[in-house]
Design a protein with these regions (language model features):
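Intrinsically disordered, low-complexity N-proximal targeting/linker segments that flank membranes
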Residues: 41-42, 46-80, 84-89, 95
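Gly/Ala-rich beta-loop-alpha elbow adjacent to hydrolase catalytic centers
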Residues: 508-513
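Compositionally biased, low-complexity flexible segments
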Residues: 3-10, 14-18, 39-52
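C-terminal His-loop and adjacent cap/lid subdomain of alpha/beta-hydrolase
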Residues: 77-140, 144-502, 522-755
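Serine residues within intrinsically disordered or low-complexity segments
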Residues: 4, 23, 35-38, 60
Length: 755
């Protein structure tokens, strides 16, 4: 750049005042009259100049791209030599090691990349902001900049004090949110003080003693290297703990195996993309908040200072929350519309007289949603049960109660529907609370029907039609509905002569377990007794259950007789009449997650020797990092394949047959039990194939019809008539043969007994 003419001095954003960084001719200047406040934010040089955080003083003529390109290295240098930024980068580099800690379940490479990105971005933001606050506190008077000796002393005090406080609070960090927050804050101060001390020490050595000019190479690269060294220490400590306490489920890695350069490149890209996205969101929020602050000051005619900044962030936060709520509602509405669509695999109402929507039913086929239609169309027939059990069987009853009407009206409809289907003539009635989308595990329903030899009635009262994550606000209604249905059925059963009265049970899995179990949240097991509930089975009880939390804190308060039993697998359950059996896997994140894990250590993350099986002993609980990993454990809780049962996470298919026998005291011989297990797997695989084939074929025919319509030709069906001079295409012939061999198309939508 030239040297003639008036010159304008550039500035850095270091805390405490204006520091000259470069000097350029005024006609090439973009930013003028800018300074920073005590935490490194842009601020006006005086009252009436620029507003906080806004780029003022745009000069004319507008700079060319070439001039801007010459300024970029200076701006980058200004950014990367800022102590707060450097502390943030060091914290971000260190956070990579905790990001690779083992959780309850393995993560995919793509998920691991997102974990790294979120952790790095979060630790950067927290580290930079905390060090800026420490620097401001050390400087004392606004506008004053602390010297390097004072900053080193501040780093030593905050780092050492934070370390001592963290050590003192650690044993009780899981006792309450107050102690957890204090412990997490102390840990943050300790690591930030250490990082700040390393940054200031490297500054003194590189720039004062050696005399190097500040640059990216003498600042940021050193900081990242120091962060990596801290990460190495974390990994070393983790390995020492593993050797001391042993590896739990050593075959379960933190991340599923990664193969190939392309896979690693994908991970790197996702990591950078995640961090970039979060950073862009933060910058956008900051920019919006500063613009709002300028508007507020124009309206009031006065500078609002920190109050204005705070109000602006509050307004921006409220706006983001409103957008999130609107987006959530859009997702909910879209899901509801999807739930109303009739699937190709289940196109017509059932023909069975013992299921809802059949000839004897009071329920309309389009009123029960996708999962309800699947449920009634997949019911077993007496002959199918006989084929597996080798004993005479009857057709079981399945009733689905739609969510239209009041709770009392739905309870009355449940009784009327059972009457119409012959449910009160069965020996076992189970009120099964579904998940949010209306789903009741098909494996559970079929296992019950096999074990009862068809002499059973399943009632499903629907309280929502959206995935469980979107139905959390419907669980109170679901619990009220469950209790009302149980009470209405119990009253009807009391009118039956004692010798012919069916036994009443309840069942719930996942969110359904929360809904069913929470009937006992007020009144305990005694309330279930008052509703004539003989016993209950609850698979994968979520952490949100009120009854679960009460029972966990004080078991006698809700269950003085000890009839609520918790086991990780059903073969460990005792033989107790009237038992309410909770089966929860040791590695089920749906049960072990907690919103407070952001800072508070959960009970199962205690001393290594006290942790439940399947919980890694070498992993330390860390604020933020452990919470992010737990979120991905939730996402991976239901990774399962049709027909392949495994005791893992939130998948309880492998436990259901035995759990039903233990809780409801149903019987089977070893040979029958094996036959049931085989049939459950075969039917699940068959139905999954049926849905896939029907959906794919339906889409294919729809695409063909669209094309033929454009050609002016008639639409086609699944039948392909062979002509003398035209053979059926080999691919089509193969598809039709596969469907014929497996009898898939013949079973789609079937619900009545075989002809």
């Amino acid at each position: 750049m030239g040297t003639s003419g008036p010159r304008q001095r550039g500035i850095t954003t270091r805390a405490g005042g204006v520091v000259e960084l470069y000097s350029i001719p005024t006609d090439q200047c973009i930013l003028t009259h800018m300074s920073t406040d005590s935490v490194g934010r842009f601020a006006g040089a005086g009252r009436g100049n620029t507003r906080p955080g806004l780029l003022r003083g745009m000069m004319s003529p507008m700079p060319s791209l070439a001039r801007i390109s010459r300024l970029i290295p200076q701006v980058v240098s200004q950014f990367t030599t800022d102590p707060a930024v450097r502390v943030g980068f060091m914290q971000a580099a260190w956070s990579v090691a905790p990001s690779f800690a083992r959780g309850l379940l393995p993560r995919t490479p793509a998920q691991q990349a997102i974990v790294v990105g979120i952790n790095a971005t979060s630790h950067y933001a927290i580290g930079a902001t905390t060090w800026a606050g420490i620097s401001s506190a050390v400087a004392g008077i606004p506008g004053r900049r602390a010297g390097w000796k004072a900053l080193l002393a501040g780093a030593a005090v905050t780092g050492g004090g934070g370390f001592l406080a963290e050590r003192a609070l650690r044993p009780r960090s899981g006792d309450s949110m107050a102690l957890a927050s204090a412990w997490a804050g102390s840990k943050l101060l300790a690591t930030t003080g250490l990082a700040g001390g390393l940054v200031m020490t490297s500054d003194v050595v590189a720039h004062r003693l050696i005399g190097r000019t500040p640059s990216v190479g003498t600042t940021l690269l050193i900081d990242v290297a120091a962060g990596c060294a801290m990460a190495g220490g974390t990994l070393f400590r983790r390995n020492l703990r593993a050797k001391r306490y042993g590896w739990v489920s050593e075959d379960r890695r933190a991340v599923d195996s990664v193969k190939g350069v392309r896979a690693y490149a994908t991970i790197a890209g996702i990591t950078v993309g995640t961090a970039t996205g979060i950073t862009a969101l933060a910058i956008g929020e900051q920019t919006t908040a500063r613009a709002i602050n300028v508007g507020l000051e124009k309206v009031t005619g006065d500078e609002l200072g920190e109050t204005g900044i705070w109000l602006s962030h509050m307004v921006t936060g409220a706006g983001l929350a409103a957008l999130a709520l609107v987006g959530l509602d859009k997702v909910r509405q879209r899901t509801l519309r999807t739930n109303e669509v009739v699937e190709p695999a289940y196109p017509s109402p059932p023909t069975s007289e013992t299921v809802s929507c059949g000839p004897n039913s009071l329920i309309e086929f389009d009123a029960i949603g996708k999962e309800g239609r699947r449920f009634v169309l997949m019911a077993l027939h007496g002959q199918q049960i006989t084929n597996v059990m080798g004993e005479a069987a009857v057709d079981p009853v399945r009733a689905v109660i739609p969510r239209d009407g009041t709770i009392q009206e739905r309870a009355e409809l449940a009784v009327a529907e059972l009457e119409a289907l012959g449910g009160f003539e069965r020996s076992v009635i189970v009120v099964a609370s579904p998940t949010g989308v209306g789903y009741v595990n098909y494996v559970m329903a079929e296992a019950l029907e096999y074990l009862a030899r068809g002499n059973s009635a399943l009632v499903v009262p629907q309280y929502a039609m959206v995935p469980s994550a979107l139905a959390l606000d419907k669980t109170t209604e679901g619990t009220e509905l469950q209790a009302e249905v149980l009470g209405a059925i119990a009253q009807r059963i009391r009118r039956i002569p004692p010798a012919r009265r069916p036994r009443l049970y309840q069942f719930g899995e996942s969110l359904g377990a929360q809904v069913a179990l929470d009937v006992a949240a007020i009144g305990g097991v005694a309330r279930l007794d008052s509703l004539d509930v003989t016993a209950g089975l609850y698979m994968g009880v979520p952490f949100r259950s009120r009854a679960w939390r009460t029972w966990w804190r004080n078991r006698r308060a809700i269950d003085p007789e000890g009839r609520m039993v918790l086991v990780p697998q059903p073969d460990e359950a005792p033989e107790i009449p009237g038992m309410h059996l909770m089966v929860v896997h040791d590695d089920d994140p749906v049960n072990k997650f907690a919103y407070t894990m952001f800072v508070r250590r959960p009970w199962w993350f205690g001393a290594p020797e006290t942790r439940p099986p399947m919980v890694p002993r070498e992993t330390l609980f860390r604020p933020i990092s452990s919470f992010v990993i737990a979120l991905f454990d939730l996402l991976n809780a239901m990774n399962q394949k049709p027909g392949a049962f495994a005791r893992r996470g939130h998948d309880y298919r492998i436990d259901l047959r035995e759990a039903l026998q233990k809780a409801y005291r149903l019987t089977s011989s070893p040979t029958q039990a094996e036959a049931i297990e085989n049939a459950l797997r075969e039917r699940e695989q068959m139905w999954a194939e049926a849905r896939l084939v029907a959906k794919t074929a339906y889409k294919a025919v729809a695409t063909i019809n669209d094309t033929l319509n454009k050609w002016g030709r008639n639409a086609v069906s699944m039948d392909f008539v062979e002509q003398e001079d035209i053979d059926i295409p080999p691919a089509w012939r193969k598809l039709m043969k596969q469907m014929s061999d497996s009898q898939l198309m013949g079973r789609l939508g079937s619900s009545g007994p075989p002809a």
